């Protein structure tokens, strides 16, 4: 199992939020948290709960592995 990379998450969160054209407040409104939560997650002062990570991925239209900075390897099924 791949390890969660908080630094990659922080960077991906900020980069993808900006690419989506969202302010911290707009993303906070989409996932029903306070602006300060987004700020703390992006600066690494706090780590989000899993429910918030899922909500962020959905709000930004990306997969959890992408958001978390986890490389997903395709399995070789021998076909």
Region locations from a protein language model:
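Residues that mark the N-terminal boundary/hinge immediately upstream of a DNA-recognition element
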Residues: 12, 23, 49-52, 63
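Short, charged recognition helix plus adjacent turn
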Residues: 1-3, 58, 68-79
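Alpha-helical residues within the helix-turn-helix
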Residues: 18, 29, 58
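DNA major-groove recognition helix of helix-turn-helix/homeodomain DNA-binding modules
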Residues: 32, 51-66
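A short, Lys/Arg-rich alpha-helix, primarily the initiator
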Residues: 1-19
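Residues in the helix-turn-helix
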Residues: 37, 47, 66
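Short alpha-helical DNA-recognition segment
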Residues: 21-40
């Amino acid at each position: 199992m791949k390890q969660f990379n908080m630094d990659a998450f922080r960077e991906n969160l900020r980069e993808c939020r900006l690419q989506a054209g969202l302010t911290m407040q707009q993303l906070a409104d989409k996932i029903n948290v306070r602006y300060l939560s987004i700020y703390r997650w992006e600066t690494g002062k706090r780590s989000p709960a899993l429910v918030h990570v899922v909500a962020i991925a959905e709000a930004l239209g990306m997969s959890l592995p992408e958001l978390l900075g986890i490389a997903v390897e395709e399995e070789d099924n021998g076909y």
